[in-house]
């Protein structure tokens, strides 16, 4: 002998699971939106490091008295909170962290050249330094794309699970509620 369960209780459980999946989708969407803002800012700031390093070379050649204040600005960009946050993210790939550390180390040497107005040495190192910055920007972009792919995949799987669950609830209601009502209606005629 098997125990009969309440149809309404069973349907309520299925609908509760649907609500849980909707909560997951909503939470993930909010996390992705918040993350995108900081990712875009990190890419923007790190991309500006290229232009700032070239501008610093021009400043060294044309107006050496402004070099120190441009070095301070560059250092502020290099140590921006959003870039430091990327370094501390739990899931940030090691490539991003290594690229950022490489830029920090290389910049210490580049800033020394700028401070003592060694234009030739700064110029000689500039192209490879900018390549390191480009590599860092590329790593950030790839990480952002990977996060998007993961988020979209989770959203799609959740939506498919919701669709499957709702389809099952409809089928179950037809079998357990609608069919017996139809049989009762036919029997009463």
Q: What is the meaning of each model-derived region?
A:
Residues 3-9, 31, 35-38, 136-139, ...:
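Juxtamembrane loop-transmembrane helix junctions in multi-pass integral membrane proteins
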Residues 5-33:
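Extreme N-terminal signal-anchor transmembrane helix of membrane signaling/transducer proteins, especially
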Residues 13-18, 31, 145-162:
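N-terminal membrane-entry
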Residues 29-36, 162-178:
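Cytosolic-side ends of inner-membrane transmembrane helices, especially those
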Residues 32-57, 68, 72:
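Juxtamembrane membrane-water interface segments immediately C-terminal to a transmembrane helix
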Residues 43, 48, 52-59, 99-150:
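Extracytoplasmic
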Residues 59-113:
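Extracytoplasmic ligand-binding sensor domains of the Cache superfamily
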Residues 176-189:
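Membrane-proximal alpha-helical signal-transduction linkers
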